[in-house]
Structure formats: C-alpha cells, structure tokens
UniProtKB/Swiss-Prot annotation:
<feature type="binding site">
    <location>
        <position position="155"/>
    </location>
    <ligand>
        <name>Zn(2+) 1</name>
    </ligand>
</feature>
<keyword id="KW-0539">Nucleus</keyword>
<keyword id="KW-0073">Auxin biosynthesis</keyword>
<comment type="function">
    <text>Transcription activator that binds DNA on 5'-ACTCTAC-3' and promotes auxin homeostasis-regulating gene expression (e.g. YUC genes), as well as genes affecting stamen development, cell expansion and timing of flowering. Synergistically with other SHI-related proteins, regulates gynoecium, stamen and leaf development in a dose-dependent manner, controlling apical-basal patterning. Promotes style and stigma formation, and influences vascular development during gynoecium development. May also have a role in the formation and/or maintenance of the shoot apical meristem (SAM).</text>
</comment>
<dbReference type="GO" id="GO:0009851">
    <property type="term" value="P:auxin biosynthetic process"/>
</dbReference>
<feature type="binding site">
    <location>
        <position position="160"/>
    </location>
    <ligand>
        <name>Zn(2+) 2</name>
    </ligand>
</feature>
<feature type="binding site">
    <location>
        <position position="144"/>
    </location>
    <ligand>
        <name>Zn(2+) 2</name>
    </ligand>
</feature>
<keyword id="KW-0927">Auxin signaling pathway</keyword>
<feature type="short sequence motif" description="Required for homo- and heterodimerization">
    <location>
        <begin position="271"/>
        <end position="274"/>
    </location>
</feature>
<dbReference type="GO" id="GO:0048653">
    <property type="term" value="P:anther development"/>
</dbReference>
<feature type="binding site">
    <location>
        <position position="144"/>
    </location>
    <ligand>
        <name>Zn(2+) 1</name>
    </ligand>
</feature>
<dbReference type="GO" id="GO:0003700">
    <property type="term" value="F:DNA-binding transcription factor activity"/>
</dbReference>
<keyword id="KW-0862">Zinc</keyword>
<keyword id="KW-0479">Metal-binding</keyword>
<feature type="binding site">
    <location>
        <position position="171"/>
    </location>
    <ligand>
        <name>Zn(2+) 2</name>
    </ligand>
</feature>
<dbReference type="GO" id="GO:0003677">
    <property type="term" value="F:DNA binding"/>
</dbReference>
<dbReference type="GO" id="GO:0009734">
    <property type="term" value="P:auxin-activated signaling pathway"/>
</dbReference>
Length: 370
C-alpha cells in the first residue's frame, strides 16, 4: 500500500504505511524544521523490483522523477492530504486504463521504473490520460486501439466491431449489429412505398383535385340544352320515322330585317312521351303543282332521324293535310289538289290574330291559358 515515510528521523508514516516494513537509510544531517520536512511516498502499483534505496541528499528537482518512490515536501497537513488524493486518483486512472487495455499493446511501456526513460513513460501516461479522459468525460466516443475508429460503447475490449471480431474476442456487444447500409435502407423504403398505400398526406401538401368527368357528346339538335342521361333521347329509344296527327295554328310573324309580317304555322307533337314544338314558315310556292304551300318543320332533325320523315298533318276545321313522302309535305285543301287551288281560304279568316307574334329564330312560348 501507499504510504508516507518521514526523512527527518521520525517514525511516522501516513496512509497505511505502518503495514509495510521498509528499510531505508536516512541522512545524518540535522533534521530540517517541520515546515520544510521532506517525505518519501511509495507507489505500490508500479514495478515491485524497483530500487527502494534513495539517497536523502537528492536535490528538490527529484520531486518530478518517475519511479517507485516520490519525494514530497511537508508544507502542512491539509496540502499533503490534497496531494495524496490527487496522486491516488491518478494511480487509479492508470490502473483502470491498463486493465482495459487502453494504449499501446506492449504493456512494458507502462513500467515507469528507473529502467524506462522519463520521456517514454510520460508519453505512455499522456496517452492513457487522453483516451481515458475521452471515454469518461462524455465529450466523445472511445477510439479503437487497432484502427483508431470509434469503438463500441459497451465493448470491454475498447475496439470496434470489425477489429473485435477479427481478433476473436468473445464480446456480447458485437454479436448482433443493428447497423444497416444506406443503400439497403433506401431499397427497403422504396419497396415499402410501392407495397403499402399512402395513408396520409405530408404536411404542406394540398388535397389532390378530383379529375373532371368527360361526358360523351350526344348527337342532338337542341341548342344550349343539356340532356340528362335518363331523358330517353338515347339512340334506339326514338324511331327514325314518325306518322302522327297534329294541330297547326296559324300565326303572324315578322322578320327582324324588313319588319314585313308573314304567316306561319306552329304545332306541338308527342313522340315517345316527349313534347316536340316547332314553327312552319312559308317558303313560297311548291314545285309539285297546284297552289299548295311548301312547309318544313323547324325541329325536324330532333326526332332522331335527321333525314326524310313522314308527317301526317291535320289542320283545324275542314282543312286536311295529306301524308307526304318527303321532309317537305304539301299542304292541300279540301278534295283534290286542283280543287284546293281554286277554293283557297285565307288562314287569317280561320284563325284570329294572336296576341303575341313570333319572329323567325325565336323560342316559342305558348299562349297563357285562361
């Protein structure tokens, strides 16, 4: 054990020095005062074969000499105890570093006896101090002894995983490693992204807009009118040709350009449960002889055929309409076509003047019911 041994001829030895029977030669000169007394301090943690006989006349510079014995000056009791505690902490640090294998693999460099040079021992002690201070201070990780890389935190051999496995040390810390290369991590993340659907949107990204439904264009002659999908105007619900009875009403219409009034006929028919309204305009004398009128239906293509159609048109009163074979039926009078030309009746005499007139190209509005 470590202890203090007085050099002034006294017997006192501190710190457990009484248990060690040490023989030393003291100086024959008169002892110095108590305040200037010198003490030997024995280091038990170094080479036991070191020489313990030291000349008492050694100069005071031997304070810093490294060996089995160190020279201490007895200033006061408190300073001695403080220096003793610091030295003991230093020794504990050296011993723990040597036990863990910190520093060079050659343990002979830790022998700080008189045979080893002072510079080499200082470098070894400095290396132990640096490595032990780095591991205990918490400022950084412990370096591996072999390669110098960062060692595993819980590794008792103070080595990294590669060096610990290459040397064959039985270290439980390096049995299983959780480290995964960056390339494998990226590959696994890409696989997970493709397999698992994205459940939530990242922060800052807006909700994606719903795609606009492109409705198929339907063939219809109705302008500015949206036909619902269940209206019944789909292909196949209406026949290509229709023969039905209708009542035509004579009205007066005028053009926007010249303002001259003319006669026209308006009607409404029901085809397939739907109402079709139109106006028949006067286009001049027909080419099939007689004085009949050549009329066309304004919405003839709305019946779905778009081609020639047969319309059975019946007028009010005694005026009858013959069935036509083309899209421009001929309006006749009573009897044959020649008789109809002779007994032509003015439509104004049959129908009163309407309250409102209709212009070409305008929408038809029926008269209000009384």
């Amino acid at each position: 054990m470590a202890g203090f041994f007085s050099l002034d001829g006294g017997g006192g030895g501190g710190g457990g020095g009484g248990n060690n029977q040490e023989d030393h030669r003291s100086n024959t000169n008169p002892p110095p005062p108590v305040s200037e007394a010198w003490l030997w301090y024995r280091n038990p943690n170094v080479n036991a074969n070191a020489n313990t006989n030291v000349n008492a006349n050694a100069p005071s510079s031997s304070n810093a000499a490294l060996g089995t014995l160190e020279l201490w000056q007895n200033h006061n009791q408190q300073e001695i105890m403080f220096q003793h505690q610091q030295h003991q902490q230093r020794l504990d640090l050296y011993s723990s570093a040597a036990g863990l294998g910190v520093g060079p693999s050659n343990h002979n460099q830790f022998d700080i006896s008189g045979e080893t040079s002072t510079a080499g021992a200082g470098r070894a002690a400095a290396m132990m101090m640096i490595r032990s201070g780095g591991s205990g201070g918490g400022s950084g990780g412990v370096s591996c002894q072999d390669c110098g890389n960062q060692a595993k935190k819980d590794c008792s051999h103070m080595r990294c995983r590669t060096c610990c496995k290459s040397r064959g040390f039985e270290c439980s810390t390096h049995v299983r490693s959780t480290w995964v290369p960056a390339a494998k991590r990226r590959e696994r993340q890409q696989q997970l992204a493709t397999v698992q659907p994205q459940t939530q949107l990242p922060r800052g990204e807006s909700v994606p807009k719903r795609h606009r439904e492109n409705l198929p264009a339907t063939s219809s002659s109705l302008v500015c009118t949206r036909i619902p999908s269940h209206s019944g105007l789909e292909v196949g619900n209406f026949p290509a040709e229709v023969s039905s009875s209708a009542v035509f009403r004579c009205v007066r219409v005028s053009s926007v350009e010249d303002g001259e009034e003319e006669f026209a006929y308006q009607t409404a028919v029901s085809i397939g449960g739907h109402i079709f309204k139109g106006i028949l305009y006067d286009l001049g004398p027909g080419s099939s002889g007689g004085g009949g009128y050549n009329v066309v239906a304004a919405g003839e293509s709305s019946s779905g055929g778009g081609g020639a159609q047969q319309l059975n048109l019946i007028t009010a009163g005694s005026v009858t309409v013959a069935t036509a074979s083309s899209s421009t039926p001929n309006l006749g009078g009573i009897g044959s076509s020649s008789a109809a030309a002779a007994t032509y009746i003015d439509p104004a005499a049959l129908y009163p003047t309407p309250i409102n007139t209709f212009m070409a190209g305008t929408q038809f509005f029926p008269n209000p019911r009384s």
